[in-house]
UniProtKB/Swiss-Prot annotation:
Found in a complex with XPO6, Ran, ACTB and PFN1. Interacts with ACTB. Interacts with ACTB in a RanGTP-dependent manner. Mediates the nuclear export of actin and profilin-actin complexes in somatic cells. Gene3D superfamilies: Leucine-rich Repeat Variant. The modification Phosphothreonine is found at residues 201, 204. Belongs to the exportin family. It comes from the Eukaryota. The keyword Transmembrane helix does not apply. Keywords: Acetylation, Cytoplasm, Nucleus, Phosphoprotein, Protein transport, Transport. It is found in: Nucleus; Cytoplasm. The keyword Transport applies. This is Exportin-6.
Length: 1125
């Protein structure tokens, strides 16, 4: 014993040293090694058993339990049966003896270790494992311990990790399912007993039927008077011990509900009991009493009571989240909803002492979250099922949800509730779309609720009604979606407004427009307060209160303009004529507002509070332009109608809009406003396309300022947008006009002069015989290249999907710039930032204008690139120039992707050199690099080469297929095909999961479209190599997220030759597996059934993989020299 005693003292001092602040990392590593070596010794567990019973040192106990855990989970197979019996007997005794005094985390760990033994040995060698747990639960002294054991068993045995064979996993699940009814009965009994015991002693008399608690909805919601009566019982006050037992029982239930199927085992009495406990969460009295009585003990009690409510709601939500509900369980669900809505009514009850919001503020935040989760699950999963029950009052439910939503104490809570309304509105919309006949009935039923929702959501986004809350929202920090908290708040609110508009267009419009009108009056009335001062114009509103009111009104106007813009889509298409007048009213107001803002130059005005009011004025102006832009599709439809009726009204709208835009296209205007004006101009030119646009003086003014060499250039983004608008005005066909009236010759001349002016400086960079290259500093040259190519690339990109005529004119204007680019390219091959921009430009040209460029010139470009990208140049770009260099190579490969996809024979002569470039120059550089750069693009190019040029490799003739019945194609260029396949195979051995997924998809696509796996060369030389690699990937768990895709791919490959797979490949694969013995290999082979359907086959694959890993784990854990029988 002395040695055990000495070891314990040594271990305690080592542990104390290890966790001491002054211990160096070096020394910690030494101690760690020492402890690991100790744990590996045969029989180390005996020392640990002594340590556990003899020490009070937490670190030592934790270490000892870790040794046991390792022994049971990794080495159990090799432990002599006598030792196992001793461990199975000693650890539970230790737990029983010390569970009251052990720290909770040690006790829980010891429970887990005992459950781990059960996972391995129950019921065969540890037959009383589960009965022991049931006995612990039934004995009042050990109930908490039994519940902890039960929860741990549910966690570890119902969904065990992969260190068990599939057969054992299935056996454990079945064993547990057999116990479910007993366990649920026990848990129900515990909860009911505690409740009943404390209900009897509750001091508060039950409320009379007429008192405030009996809500007016109860008669509807609760059909059975007995459950109503039960729910009216006062909530008992529990002692600490009972509180603890109930929380453990509810935790057990929540975990059990996560995996057991919905069935009759879940009895009505269990559900009612859970709801009793859910009431603890909405009991504000307990909190009040705790705070009145003041003692910390009482405060803890208040929190614990709240926690019981949270746990009970977790149980309810576990049941709610199950989409598949057996018929016999539907009635239970209905009862659950009724009981939950009783709770919802209770927490949204408004009486003198409490406003709803203050009541919600008093509740535990987690309880509110759980309750909101319940409501979300109810609407998203069960509403369609429940709505048809006549006894379920959906409209009353919406009334409660409305109160609950608009009294949420936090912004996050409000967002979550808006999500629920969005789900409800989506449900209504899809219901109406699927059953058009019921539209009126559905809308009549919900109309009042929707109008109320719309009004309240609109009030919530206005500072006029909600300033205190809105001021709290952050409008500076961007989240992951690149929006601020305020923008997110506004966007989510406007989505709800838009969904109501879709269902009730007239109501929505008549609710929103007057509110917009009120705020517009304030804005349009500002003109009377503008006075001229020495330095310009000033807004003569200075009183602090007036400034604050103006600030609120401007913020609201900005939000309402966004709302009006969001609704634009509900005025077009089939309803254009019916809602024409409403839309015209909106558009006329918007045009008036934008013109007003531009004329009195509110964006440049001096104000009393410049840091607040100036951004407000700029924002309103920008939002009015953006809202008008949202109506561009409506204007386009109006343009079509106006063309037939030749209406002056439409011409005036467009001309006035241009008068509003033109003053803003200037370097003196703030970026936000400038870009809004540019975007509106682009929409007019691209979407509306009025014939007279180019002849409007305001547009000609913009055109002249852009081609004027002396004019100051706009910022990059604005310049690109304005040039796009002008180019589209000249290039896009006018709607509703025949080809003969399109005025192409005149438009072509104008377009050429526009492009010529834009690329003037760029052309001057090209060296010629008469004028050798001007010495422009490199920095300036780069600026010229960037400015010109960004504009030209954008112009091409925007024309690429248009008519042939538009593309022809575009290419005629650009021809010289393209030739200049090709001439300059070699000079900048070592400047990766310039090459990157040039290749972007060429890529856009190839995608949009390759037909117009013509074959000879396209060939010249491709040849130039192939000559420039030598192996040395590629290596320099990829290896030494970082991300820009890689981007250059990726763009070059993208250009080649466009080339290999071109139908017809034109570019076929390039295939050999493109494949050679890929396989001999790019692939060797990137194959072994861990970085994913360039790989995705290279493999996409290889895939497109195969997919679009299949006959380059497989020559199939009609005659051959007629003669043989099945064409066994002639194979050509076999070495190249094999090299490409080899590269795909290699890519599956690399860690990058995105590349793996992409390449697996490419192979599967080639099989679907071209029968790749059936081709003789693939079938005979590659098929089972690929299957082998994919199986190994599954075994190594390196790409676990793709398990399903890999399983399907293995099936598709194996199905080409099932006989070969079962008879030759599988035995061979098992023979080559290391870490398993012959007997285990036989079992693995026998368990792989010869099923040939996809679900069974993939199930067999995953079973094989799981069991192979399990056997290896077992064998690794056996002590050396173990004899296996």
């Amino acid at each position: 014993m002395a040695s055990e005693e000495a070891s314990l003292r040594a271990l305690e001092s080592l542990m104390t040293e290890f966790f001491h602040d002054c211990t160096t990392n070096e020394r910690k590593r030494e101690i760690e090694e020492l402890l690991n070596n100790f744990a590996q010794q045969v029989g180390a567990w005996r020392f640990c058993l002594y340590f556990l019973s003899s020490t009070r040192n937490d670190y030592v106990m934790m270490y000892s339990l870790t040794v046991f855990e390792n022994l049971i989970n990794k080495m159990w197979l090799g432990v002599p049966s006598q030792d196992k019996m001793e461990i199975r007997s000693c650890l539970p005794k230790l737990l029983l003896a010390h569970h009251k005094t052990l720290p909770y985390f040690i006790r829980n760990k010891l429970c887990k270790v005992i459950v781990d033994i059960g996972r391995q040995d129950w019921p065969m060698f540890y037959h009383d494992f589960f009965t022991n747990i049931l006995q612990l639960i039934q004995s009042p002294v050990t109930t908490p311990l039994g519940l902890i054991m039960l929860k741990t068993t549910s966690e570890e045995l119902a969904c065990p990790r992969e260190d068990l064979s599939v057969a054992r996993k299935e056996e454990l699940r079945k064993l547990l399912l057999d116990q479910v009814q007993t366990v649920l009965g026990l848990l129900t009994g515990i909860l009911e007993t505690v409740w009943d015991k404390h209900s009897v002693t509750a001091a508060t008399p039950p409320p009379s039927p007429t008192s405030g608690e009996s809500g007016d909805l109860l008669s509807n919601l609760l059909q059975s008077p007995s459950s109503a009566k039960l729910l009216h019982q006062p909530i008992p006050i529990l002692d600490v011990e009972s509180e603890y037992v109930c929380s453990l029982a509810l935790e057990c239930l929540a975990h059990l509900f996560s995996w057991i199927p919905l069935s009759a085992s879940i009895t009505p009495s269990l559900l009612t009991t859970i709801f009793h406990f859910a009431r603890f969460g909405c009991d504000t009295r307990a909190r009040k009493m705790a705070s009145v009585n003041g003692s910390s003990q009482n405060c803890v009690l208040g929190q614990e009571r709240g926690r019981l409510g949270v746990l009970a709601m977790s149980c309810i939500n576990e049941l709610m989240s199950k989409n598949c509900v057996p018929m016999e369980f539907e009635e239970y669900l209905l009862r659950m909803f009724q009981q939950t809505f009783y709770l919802l009514q209770k927490i949204t009850k408004d009486n003198n002492a409490h406003t709803v919001k203050s009541r919600l503020e008093e509740l535990d935040e987690s309880y509110i979250e759980k309750f909101t989760d319940f409501l979300r699950l109810f609407v998203s999963v069960h509403l369609r099922r429940i709505e048809s029950y006549s006894q379920f009052p959906v409209v009353e439910f919406l009334t409660l949800l409305f109160k609950y939503t608009f009294h949420q104490p936090t912004h996050e809570g409000y967002f979550s509730c808006l999500d629920i309304w969005t789900l409800f509105l989506d449900y209504l919309t899809s219901k109406i779309k699927s059953r058009l006949g019921d539209k009126e009935a559905v809308l009549n039923r919900y109309e009042d609720a929707l109008v109320l929702l719309l009004t309240e959501v609109l009030n919530r986004i206005q500072f006029r009604y909600n300033q205190a809350q809105l001021e709290e929202l952050d409008d500076e920090t961007l989240d992951d979606d690149q929006q601020t908290e305020w923008q997110r708040y506004l966007r989510q609110s406007l989505e709800v407004v838009a969904k109501v508009m879709e269902l009730l267009p007239t109501h929505a419009f008549s609710t929103l427009f007057p509110v917009l009108q009120d705020n517009l009056e304030v804005y349009l009335g500002l003109q009377q307060f503008v006075v001229t001062s020495g330095s310009g114009h000033r807004l003569n509103i200075t009183a602090e209160n007036d400034c604050r009111r103006l600030h609120c009104s401007l913020r609201d106007l900005s939000s309402l303009l966004q709302a009006v813009g969001r609704l634009a889509e509900y005025f077009i298409g089939d309803v254009f004529a019916a809602r024409f007048n409403d839309a015209l009213t909106v558009v006329e107001r918007l045009v008036k507002v934008t013109l007003y803002g531009s004329q009195i130059k509110l964006y440049n005005i001096e104000t009393a509070v410049p840091s607040v009011l100036k951004p407000d004025l700029i924002d309103v102006h920008a939002q009015s332009l953006a809202a008008l832009q949202a109506y561009s599709h409506w204007l386009a439809q109006y343009c079509g109608e106006a063309h037939r009726q030749n209406t002056q009204q439409f011409v005036t709208l467009i001309s006035t809009t241009m008068d509003a835009i033109t003053p803003l296209i200037s370097t003196k205007v703030q970026d936000k406003l400038l870009l809004s004006a540019c975007h509106l101009l682009v929409s007019l030119a691209t979407t509306v396309r009025p014939v007279f646009l180019i002849s409007i003086p305001a547009v000609q003014k913009v055109f002249n300022s852009i081609i004027d060499a002396s004019a100051q250039r706009l910022t990059d983004k604005a310049q690109v947008l304005v040039c796009r608008a002008l180019s589209n005005t000249l290039l896009l066909p006018w709607p509703n006009l025949p080809e003969s009236e399109q005025q192409w010759p005149l438009r072509s001349i104008n377009h050429a002069s526009l492009i010529s002016a834009l690329s003037r400086d760029y052309h001057s960079l090209k060296p010629s015989a008469t004028a050798p290259q001007r010495k422009v500093p490199l920095g300036d040259t780069k600026v010229i290249i960037h400015q010109t190519l960004s504009v030209l690339e954008d112009i091409v990109e925007n024309i690429s999907g248009e008519s042939t005529k538009s593309r022809q004119i575009c290419y005629q204007s650009l021809q010289e710039s393209v030739q200049v680019s090709l001439a300059l390219f070699p000079a900048f091959i070592h400047q990766s930032d310039v090459t990157d921009e040039m290749l972007s430009f060429f890529l856009t040209l190839f995608r949009g204008l390759r037909v117009q460029m013509g074959v000879p010139f396209t060939e010249q470009i491709i040849q130039t690139f192939l000559n420039m990208f030598t192996r040395e140049q590629l290596a320099e770009s990829i290896l030494h120039e970082g991300s820009t260099g890689c981007r250059v190579v990726e763009k070059f490969l993208k250009i080649l992707q466009v080339v290999v996809q071109e139908p017809g024979q034109v570019f076929k002569p390039f295939l050999p050199s493109i494949i050679a470039l890929c396989m001999e120059q790019v692939y060797p550089i990137i194959a072994e690099r861990p970085s994913p750069d360039v790989k995705a693009e290279l493999f996409e190019l290889l895939f497109r080469t195969l997919h679009h040029n299949w006959r380059y490799f497989f020559k199939s003739t009609v005659l051959a297929s007629v003669q043989r019945g099945i064409a066994e194609e002639q194979m050509e260029n076999e070495p190249q095909f094999s090299a490409i396949m080899q590269a795909f195979g290699q890519s599956f051995l690399q860690p990058d999961i995105h590349l793996f997924k992409q390449n697996l998809f490419y192979l599967e696509t080639l099989n679907t479209k071209q029968k790749l796996y059936h081709k003789k060369i693939f079938r005979t030389t590659m098929l089972f190599q690929f299957v082998n690699v994919l199986l190994q990937v599954l075994v190594h768990k390196s790409h676990d997220l793709l398990q399903e895709e890999i399983g399907i791919a293995i099936y598709n490959m194996a199905s080409v030759d099932f006989d070969g797979f079962f008879a030759a490949f599988l035995p061979e694969f098992l023979t080559s597996c290391d870490g398993v013995d012959a007997n285990q290999k036989n079992v693995l082979g026998r368990n792989f059934k010869m099923d040939r359907d996809l679900p069974s086959f993939t199930q067999n694959v995953h079973r094989l993989v799981n069991d192979l890993r399990y056997y290896r784990l077992c064998n690794d854990s056996l002590p050396p020299g173990t004899v296996k029988l």
